[in-house]
Design a protein with these regions (language model features):
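Catalytic beta/alpha-barrel core
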Residues: 74-80, 98-107, 126, 130-131
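Histidine-anchored nucleotide/phosphate-binding helix
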Residues: 89-92, 105-108, 143
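Surface-exposed patches in mature extracellular/periplasmic domains of secreted proteins
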Residues: 46, 100-104, 155-158
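His/Asp/Glu-enriched, well-ordered alpha-helical/loop segment
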Residues: 74, 112-172
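Active-site environment of divalent metal-dependent phosphoester hydrolases
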Residues: 82-86, 106-111, 161-163
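Polyanionic/metal-chelating signatures
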Residues: 1-99
């Protein structure tokens, strides 16, 4: 039997469980989380003796994020809005992490920036009707426009319902 460990960490943008809907606050929470992982790595013994400040998440989560912060494991962020994609690229550059982007409904709008950052994207079939405000600019040609700009594009399934699966014909 061949078995491989985890290959990536996945995070969503704008998740209701994040406790915020403000984008600036959301990114502040990501920065605090990554700063906490770095602090935890440097002061693990102090953490275990209760001599550190309270961190943003549990010890198990801090441990799980160490390979991401160290650049050994990619972080897959699910983002749609062009401004959020650019913010994710800035975040990855600031923290020196390997980043993959998923969904990227408005990726075609910032395809040059994604290509310049050498960040691969995972896209699926979509139609011209947005599902939320973050994907108002989505286009059926998103994957083709990203590829034409030099972005590495991975085609993924976008859902299990009949309607979502039916949109496979819309990949261009």
């Amino acid at each position: 039997m061949l078995r491989k460990g985890s290959i990536a960490m996945v995070g969503g943008f704008g998740n209701p469980t994040a406790g915020t809907s403000a984008r600036a606050e959301y990114w502040a929470k990501w920065r605090r989380l990554f700063d906490d992982v770095k602090a935890y790595q440097l002061r693990r013994a102090a953490y275990e003796s209760g001599s550190t400040r309270e961190f943003a998440t549990s010890q198990a989560n801090l441990e799980a994020l160490i390979p991401v912060v160290a650049g050994q494991m990619p972080l897959i962020l699910d983002v749609d809005r062009a401004s959020d994609i650019l913010a994710a690229l800035d975040f990855a550059k600031a923290y020196g992490i390997k980043l993959w982007l998923a969904s990227v409904s408005e990726g075609w709008m910032v395809a040059k920036e994604i290509a310049a950052a050498k960040v691969p994207v995972m896209v699926g079939a979509m139609n011209d009707i947005p599902t939320d405000f973050a994907s108002l600019g989505q286009r059926r040609e998103n994957a083709a426009l990203l590829k034409a700009a030099g972005v590495t594009v991975v085609i993924v399934g976008t859902g299990t319902s009949g309607a979502e699966s039916f949109n496979v014909r819309n990949i261009r």
